[in-house]
Amino acid sequence: MNHGRRSILVKSVTAAGWMTFGLETFAHERTGTSSNAMRLISIGGALTEIVYLLKANTQLVGVDATSIYPTAATRLPNVGYARSLSAEGILALRPTQLIATEDAGPPIALRQIGDAGIPVSMLPSGHQFIDVINRVRTIGRLVHKTDAAEVLASRLLLEWSSTQKRVANSKINNTRVLFILSQNPSQLMVGGEKTSAAAMIAYAGARNAITRVSGFKPLTPESVIAANPDVIVLTDQGMKAVGGISGVLRFPGVKQTRAGKEQNIISLEAMYLLGFGPRMPLAVAELNLLLQHAMA
């Protein structure tokens, strides 16, 4: 990046494709980088999964802490959590390209990486299926795997069509679902509207039990009881952290809900459930199936 007053160009991806706009942050995109020479760092488990599916993983020299699938990604140098990146640690890996979702940071770290002349491509972290397809195609262009990206996009579109048919036939549209984010038994954090959890619940054919708040917010016992979810969903990591189903039932108010009384409590791995990566159609189908079983 130019650290002076000059406006530079950053590539942003929208549903319509590439769009450039002026900012005084991040790096300009360098041209002429060959795929063989690329040293790629991927910030975001969903992005890393796409890189592997495009068979561009030989270009990877580092990933973030959420890049746990496939297992091979965990053997790469880890640059930490997406929201607390260290420019020094990233630059030590001598990358020639960094990809990340727009919620990565802090901005100063990304600015420092850009100042060092490293292209930084920020991808929208939207929670719609089309966002998954857009990320596949964008990464395909960045790693010079456009043909493979189109093959993958076509496969995902077929999987998505199949999932949508399954959801439409499942008849769980009145099922009220509460997503608990908490990994701390002393505080109940839930997924309100405009969250990845709310999007997955809706895609799976059910209703979010929390509709009056947006984002991930703490919830009082009275609000939990009033929400009265039919099913409670957690990540596998969250379920383990609170001590399993018995731990979930210890959250104030949960025992008084239908989900608590009937122990309709399910979990899925965090990135699989909330990452909106290439496994998203399968995750929606599995969540739908688990909800059907819980309500049977």
Give, region by region, the residue ranges found by the protein language model.
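Proline-aspartate-enriched helix->loop->beta-strand connector
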Residues: A87-A100, P221-Q237
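Short secondary-structure boundary segments
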Residues: G44, E102-D103, S125, V213, ...
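N-terminal secretory signal peptides and thylakoid transit peptides that target proteins
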Residues: M1-G17
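His/Asp/Glu-enriched short active-site or ligand-binding loop at hydrolase and phosphoryl-transfer sites
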Residues: G191-F216, D236, S267
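Extracytoplasmic substrate-binding proteins
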Residues: T33-R39, I108-P185, N208-S214, Q263-A296
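A short, structured surface patch at a secondary-structure boundary
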Residues: R39-L93, Q97-P107, I245
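A ligand-binding cleft/hinge motif common to bilobed small-molecule-binding domains
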Residues: A104-D115, V233-L249
